[in-house]
Design a protein with these regions (language model features):
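C-terminal transmembrane helical hairpin of 12-TM major facilitator-type secondary transporters
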Residues: 257, 277, 283-289, 295, ...
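C-terminal ends and interior cores of transmembrane alpha-helices
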Residues: 94-107, 315-327
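Cytoplasmic helix-loop-helix junction between adjacent transmembrane helices
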Residues: 116-153
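Helix-to-loop junctions at the C-terminal end of transmembrane segments
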Residues: 72-85, 293-304, 390-391
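Hydrophobic core of transmembrane alpha-helices in multi-pass small-molecule transporters
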Residues: 31, 111-126, 250, 332-346
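Helix-loop-helix hairpin linking two adjacent transmembrane segments in secondary transporters
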Residues: 151-202
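Extracytoplasmic
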Residues: 18-55, 73-76, 163, 259-265
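Extracytoplasmic gate region of multi-pass secondary transporters
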Residues: 40-44, 234-293, 382
Length: 425
């Protein structure tokens, strides 16, 4: 037993299981660390005005940041298996503080690429979705879907909810001051996790929440993290479920992070919607995303996850197609933001849960890391492609229509998916 066990409440003496404390710690760190992904997007114009760099020069590192965020997930899966959540959060926080400090003080383009492009993508990338998978898998038997929902919502909410505040701070005191929002918030959440966070319930003399029998601690992996990640991919690639989840989650990335997060503001500008209003629409999506994802986690514990995903993708596809053809007013966009926000990343809990059900509580999160990589690679392609399409055609309509149709294809694909067999823990 860990030496920290004495400092923690023994079994049966606390009404609140420490699993919920871990969810709270991971939620706070995920929200503030991923805010570093979203906040720079609303600072492009003031940075361009101060530094004299073009929008294109400032946008390219934004796409790199998003791609790195997704691409480092598979290796992060192996690292998380080998070293545990606490050490990985320690590494992530150090990278994040370095990236934000470099971004706040930058005057040269190499600082833009290294700080905003590389470090601010890598830092949340090594923990964000892995905490969403690993904490529920290790700490929960009961309410696992709800825990996944809470943590899954943190990622999208963090990237969106601080955008209006950052835009306002930038107008008042400059873009460098706006970057203090993720700096202060993530710094505090980082230190709190290092103080109170633990890798497993067994480290403090507990069993996972809802466990009816003692859950043994798996033997520590002896392979390096690259081998662990490749082994997870090898295990996943043998199953049809893996390819279906990777394909549909890539469509999730195309229709969320790759489209609306990056292009909703200029889409609104094409429709005559002021910048301030469109920035608040992203915040509304972020707030209702959290509600929708937590609700999705609750539903995952009660209903067939395959059919939940079919409904989620179907509603998202219809919403995107509607947005193209509707006579969109500010009120219409607000209604879209609420409805779309509820569905923005509601796909995460059932996707994670199906991964853990199929591949087990240890390997499942590492397999999901590869699925998540597909999500963000596709998002990065869409982010770039939608911008090029807009420049060539003068409209975002083809991009939004394509995303909507792909969502409907994803919805239909789950009707043919077999119920996964439960993998051993």
């Amino acid at each position: 037993m860990s030496t920290n066990a004495a400092a923690m409440p023994p079994v049966g003496r606390s009404r609140l299981h420490y699993a919920w404390v871990m969810v709270g710690l991971a939620f706070l760190y995920s929200v503030f660390s991923t805010s570093a992904l979203g906040v720079p997007a609303v600072l492009i114009v003031p940075m361009s005005q101060e530094l004299g760099w073009t929008i294109g020069e400032l946008s390219a590192p934004q796409g790199l940041r998003l791609a790195i965020f997704g691409l480092c997930a598979p290796l992060a899966g192996g690292l998380m298996l080998r070293y545990g959540p606490r050490r990985m959060v320690a590494i992530s926080g150090a990278l994040l503080m370095a990236g934000l400090a470099m971004s706040i003080g930058m005057t040269e383009k190499w600082q833009l690429w290294l700080g905003m492009g590389v470090l601010l993508g890598l830092a949340p990338g090594v923990t964000a979705m892995q905490l969403t998978a690993v904490i529920p898998a290790r700490w929960f038997v009961a309410h696992r879907g709800l825990a996944i929902g809470i943590l899954g919502g943190a990622v999208a909410t963090g990237t969106l909810i601080f955008m209006p505040l950052a835009a306002w701070v930038s107008e008042q005191w400059g873009w460098r001051a706006a970057l203090l929002i993720p700096t202060v918030g993530s710094g505090a959440a980082w230190l709190l996790f290092l103080w109170l966070g633990r890798d497993r319930p067994q480290d403090i003399g507990l069993q996972p929440l809802g466990a009816t029998a003692p859950v043994p601690v798996p033997a520590a992996p002896t392979s390096n993290f690259v081998q662990l990640s490749i082994a997870a991919l090898a295990a996943g690639s043998k199953h049809r479920t893996f390819w279906l989840l990777a394909f549909t989650f890539a469509i999730c990335g195309v229709s969320s992070f790759g489209l609306t997060q990056a292009h909703l503001v200029p889409f609104c500008g094409d429709r005559g919607i002021p910048l301030g209003v469109s920035a608040w629409l992203l915040a509304v999506i972020g707030v209702f995303d959290l509600v929708g994802t937590i609700g999705s986690g609750w539903l995952c514990d009660r209903y067939d996850n395959r059919w939940l995903l079919a409904w989620y993708y179907g509603f998202r596809g219809l919403a995107l197609v509607w947005l193209v053809y509707a006579d969109v007013s500010t009120l219409g966009l607000l209604i879209f933001a609420v409805v779309y926000g509820l569905d923005f990343i509601a796909t995460v809990p059932p996707t994670v849960r199906l991964s853990v059900q199929t591949f087990g509580q240890e390997t499942g999160p590492a397999v999901f890391a590869w699925i998540f990589a597909a999500h963000h690679v596709a998002a990065g392609v869409m982010l770039f492609g939608a911008g090029v399409s807009r420049d060539m055609l003068g409209t975002y309509a083809p991009s939004f229509l394509l995303a909507g149709v792909l969502c409907l294809v994803a919805a239909a694909s789950f009707t043919a998916m077999k119920r996964p067999r439960l993998a051993p823990a």
